[in-house]
Amino acid sequence: GTGAITEMIIPNLRPDAKFIAMEINADFVKVLRERFPSITVHEDSAANTPKYLKQLGAEHCDSIVSGLPWAFFSEGLQDALLDGAVDALRPGGMFATYTYITSYPMPSSVKFRNRLRARFSEVGVTHVIWANVPPAMVIWARK
């Protein structure tokens, strides 16, 4: 995307934190690099996050925050992306994404949450954030 989530994360990072962003769309990569010159943005699939962690000298990361539209992805793409996330996260690491209340009951969204449960030790959903338009919830998972 264009950095709405990134904009919220950066001010809350620890001083010693390393932050990388993954974006597959070249136009969005350009926007992100212009908006956030202090971070590293890779033009690649999030499924390849482990490769970029290794380039940083890190085997794993503490957390992954995703703004991907999971309910609209094929099962194969969901699997590839989630497998990359699991490989990238340290034991106990956290994965977080969001869903809109309108897509939460969709069969593909239900299947996505089942995929999370199959890969993570703990999965949960926050309360509905009614101030968001459209209302949304955060789905989180602990490795």
Question: Where in the sequence are the language-model features?
Answer:
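Conserved SAM-binding loop of SAM-dependent methyltransferases across substrates and taxa
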Residues: 2-15
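Conserved SAM/SAH-binding beta-strand->alpha-helix loop
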Residues: 25-26, 45
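Conserved SAM-binding loop
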Residues: 32-33
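Conserved SAM-binding strand-loop segment of SAM-dependent methyltransferases
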Residues: 38-51
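A short acidic, Gly/Pro-enriched loop at the edge of an enzyme's catalytic core
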Residues: 52-63
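A short glycine-rich, Lys/Arg-flanked "PGG" loop and its adjoining helix->strand segment in the class I
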Residues: 79-91
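Conserved beta-strand signature within the Rossmann-like core of class I S-adenosyl-L-methionine
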Residues: 89-99
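Class I S-adenosyl-L-methionine
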Residues: 107-143
